[in-house]
């Protein structure tokens, strides 16, 4: 299995996109995520997307500054946080991504409307070396735009297989020699279900053990 080592992500924090996304007003897209905004000391300055995980918690990206109600940050330092957020009715079903399957990346745009991009999942894992988490993120080639960070990666069966982080610049970095991403139109990075499930297990253990709050954010 080939690893793409990277020292930065482009598009996750800064403005920009890596392709053309489309507005989507369908119920399935709009119901799969919600908007989150930064709180004090920079209220509403930053925006991201988030996905409901269960009745009480949702997940989004850690790199979005000052997100309120963060209950837990990834134990390895990966780009994931759990936030306190009550489910509004049903919450989505999750599963692991499958190499080669078609997906839809969903999230908000800077214009506060739902946007989507189509792509597929690739086998090559992505390592953000500057993060030092050691976690293997996943790759799809659907386009992303600022605001889609934390938004769902939807499989064709309606399950969510991960959440978007950002994109890797193939303009500045040649990855053509990596057979695991051959044919990819672009490299968009997402946190796969396996990492989210692992971190939920740790958070759940800490919640069940009042003496073990090492990883729970205060």
Regions found by a protein language model. Give the residues of each.
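Sec-dependent signal peptide recognition
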Residues: 1-10
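C-terminal motif of bacterial Sec signal peptides marking the signal peptidase cleavage site
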Residues: 15-16
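C-terminal cap/linker of serine protease catalytic domains
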Residues: 19-25, 88-91, 165-218
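A conserved glycine-rich beta-strand in the N-terminal activation segment of trypsin-fold
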Residues: 20-24, 29-74
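Terminal peptide-recognition signature
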Residues: 36, 50, 56, 60, ...
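Active-site loop architecture of trypsin-fold serine endopeptidases
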Residues: 45-47, 62, 68-71, 110-118, ...
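Conserved active-site neighborhood of the chymotrypsin/trypsin-like protease fold
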Residues: 56-115, 209-213
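Flexible, gly/ser-rich surface segments that form the specificity/activation loops bordering the active-site cleft
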Residues: 90-138, 143-149, 164-176
């Amino acid at each position: 299995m080939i690893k793409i080592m990277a020292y930065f992500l482009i598009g996750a924090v800064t403005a920009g996109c890596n392709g053309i996304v489309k507005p989507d007003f369908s119920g399935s897209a709009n119901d799969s995520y919600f908007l989150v905004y930064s709180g004090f000391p920079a209220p509403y300055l930053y925006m991201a997307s988030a996905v409901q995980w269960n009745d009480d918690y949702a997940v989004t990206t850690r790199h979005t500054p000052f997100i309120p109600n963060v209950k837990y940050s990834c134990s390895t330092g990966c780009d994931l946080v759990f936030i306190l957020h009550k489910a509004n009715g049903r919450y989505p079903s999750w599963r692991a991504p499958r190499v080669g399957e078609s997906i839809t990346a969903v999230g908000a745009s800077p214009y506060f409307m739902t946007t989507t991009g189509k792509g597929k999942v690739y086998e090559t894992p992505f390592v953000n070396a500057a993060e030092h988490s050691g976690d293997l993120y996943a790759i799809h080639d659907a386009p992303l735009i600022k605001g889609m960070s934390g938004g769902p990666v939807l499989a064709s069966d309606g399950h969510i297989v991960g959440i978007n982080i950002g994109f890797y610049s193939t303009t500045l970095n040649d990855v053509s020699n990596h057979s695991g991403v051959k044919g990819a139109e672009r490299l968009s990075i997402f946190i796969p279900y396996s990492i989210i499930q692992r971190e939920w297990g740790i958070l759940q253990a800490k919640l069940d053990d009042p003496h073990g709050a090492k990883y729970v954010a205060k």
